[in-house]
Amino acid sequence: MLFRSLTPFDTAAHTALTADGFYGTHYAKARTWNAVPDMITYYDLANTLTVWNVTAAGQPTEGQTTGLYDTDKLSVYDKYAMFLHGNNGLSRVQGNGSGRILVIKDSYANCFVPYLTANYADIDVVDFRNYNYGLDKLIADNGYDQILVLYNFDSFKSDPYLYRAGVQG
């Protein structure tokens, strides 16, 4: 199926939580003296996240299962790392919908992935900075309905790890 009917994430059905004092990537690069911090808004979701240990091509073993957010990160400088517990090589989010999606991403997508829980049963997330084994076996073994590539454009055009997508696994 080329397209599937998706239901927008219902923000009214979930509790919104906020964290202030967030300085993002652009601040980290520019360090302007008059920067105004942003606020992170996220939704309290009961979905689970499993971070997989991948030590060889096509041989992931199940690792730690936890919630979507590491709220301890909200008290440190890199608050954004609270989403999906940072940039893991391979993670799986259990959703509330049906079907499977593979998200190939940089950290730009971490805050977006929770919104996919309304539409997919399994959301696999790959970050090539920490996943060295190509996608062929992963895709063949998991029968994804859709694949989403979600990057910050500047990162995508200069990502030194994208070649790993084509590594034979």
Which residues make up each language-model segment?
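Extracellular glycan-modifying ectodomains
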Residues: 1-169
